[in-house]
Curated annotation (Swiss-Prot):
Location in or out of the cell: Virion membrane; Host cell membrane
Protein name: Superinfection exclusion protein
Coiled coil regions in record: none
Pfam families: Serpin
Residues of the signal peptide: 1-15
Topology in membrane: Peripheral membrane protein
Primary location recorded for the protein, binned into one broad class: virion
GO molecular function annotation: serine-type endopeptidase inhibitor activity
Reported function: Prevents cell to cell fusion via its interaction with A56 protein. The A56-K2 complex associates with components of the entry fusion complex (EFC) presumably to avoid superinfection and syncytium formation.
GO cellular component: extracellular space; host cell plasma membrane; membrane; virion membrane
Homology family: Belongs to the serpin family. Orthopoxvirus OPG040 subfamily.
Keyword Cell membrane: no
Length: 373
């Protein structure tokens, strides 16, 4: 039996809104949170859903039906959906402050017979032929690094002599805050979780932001939107007494509604610096949504090949760094906003959730929670 590896890589940057696509990634995040309630988490819902979408293109039979249902794409022609998906984020880097970079690579072993129709339709998006038994790790890493700038994305534990197909997508986001935090005002202060209190570097800025208190089943949460400079991308921060309940309530339509309820306010915002890196085997999560593609007897990818491929591994590596300048930030001139009214105090000194969202498409590039900065 022939096997397939899907590897989703993410590093913490349209008018047709693919909410089902976004929701599939959100559901995957919720499954990751279950059993990891006390851990810092960073995950790319977009990276996860994009890998599932790229598995859908060659899928047929029940495998295709399950993937369509997972992303609620049953009434959508995949050709236009794919074009909109790629064009939604894969834009030229037009700003020195904030950009996203999306790449996709499909590596197929030379022994697999690809249908000419499939090759003609999708080869321009990054379809490569190679011998997986001859230095495949170095060859794949070299191609991915050349296209995305990310190094060593695969290792020998992810590929083996059974691997005949590897799908790798990368999304890199680099953002500078619209109103950066003043590094001279960062001070050590307390952060408290259920295990106690620790001292962390707490950033501070006084400026006008969009924020509000939202209510979910009688639970109140403070939410604020931090915009990135020269971009349609924002980080949404939420804090409250029951953050698991907040996360359980998140869906694409809910985020649309909550963001529409945020109004302009003057905040004295305090946010800890944080850096999170997670490497996860997410096969079991994807298997709950689309089980047949992981089953060697039931998987079908006949739109691409008649060879009996099935998926046997799925990973995601994700990383995020947040500091005074922004997210994965480079040095920049600090802008300080002057305000007249008394600012509303909002300090993220207990566990909180963050969501980095492309505001036009609704795509969630990254989301996670900070239990201990």
């Amino acid at each position: 039996m022939i096997v397939l590896l899907i590897l989703s890589l993410a590093c913490t940057a349209f008018t047709y809104r693919l909410q089902g696509f976004t929701n599939a990634g959100i559901v995957a995040y919720k499954n990751i949170q279950d059993g990891n309630e006390d851990d810092n988490i960073v995950f790319s819902p977009f990276g996860y859903s994009f890998s599932m979408f790229m598995s859908l293109l060659p899928a047929s039979g029940n495998t295709k039906v399950e993937l369509l249902k997972t992303m609620d794409l049953r009434k959508i022609d995949l050709g236009p959906a794919f074009t909109e998906l790629i064009s939604g984020l894969a834009k030229p880097k037009t700003s020195k402050y904030t950009y996203t970079d999306l790449t996709y690579q499909s590596f197929v072993d030379n022994t697999v017979c690809i249908k000419p129709s499939y090759y003609q339709q999708y080869h321009r998006f990054g379809l490569y032929r190679l011998n997986f038994r001859r230095d495949a790790v170095n060859k794949i890493n070299s191609i991915v690094e050349r296209r995305s700038g990310m190094s060593n994305v695969v290792d020998s534990t992810m590929l083996d002599n059974n691997t005949l197909w590897a799908i790798i997508n990368t999304i890199y986001f680099k953002g500078t805050w619209q109103y950066p935090f003043d590094i001279t005002k960062t001070h050590n202060t307390s952060f408290t979780n259920k295990y106690g209190t620790k001292t962390v570097p707490m950033m501070s800025v006084v400026t006008k932001l969009q924020g509000n208190t939202i209510t979910i089943d009688d639970e109140e949460y403070d939410m604020v939107r931090l915009q990135y400079k020269d971009a349609n991308i924002s980080m949404y921060l939420a804090i409250g007494d029951n953050m698991t309940h907040f996360t359980d309530s998140i869906m694409a339509a809910k985020l649309d509604y909550w963001s529409s309820q945020l109004g302009n306010k003057v905040y004295n915002l305090k946010l800890p610096r944080f850096s999170i890196e997670n490497k996860r085997d997410i096969k079991s999560i994807a298997e709950m949504m689309a089980p047949s593609m992981f089953n060697p007897d039931n998987a079908s990818f006949k739109h691409m090949t008649r060879d009996p491929l099935y998926i046997y591994k799925m990973f995601q590596n994700a990383k995020i760094d947040v500091n005074e300048q922004g997210t994965v930030a480079e040095a920049s001139t600090i802008m300080v906003a002057t305000v007249r009214s008394s600012p509303e105090e909002l300090e993220f000194n207990t566990p909180f959730v963050f969501i980095i969202r492309h505001d036009i498409t609704g795509f969630i590039l990254f989301m996670g929670k900070v239990e201990s900065p």
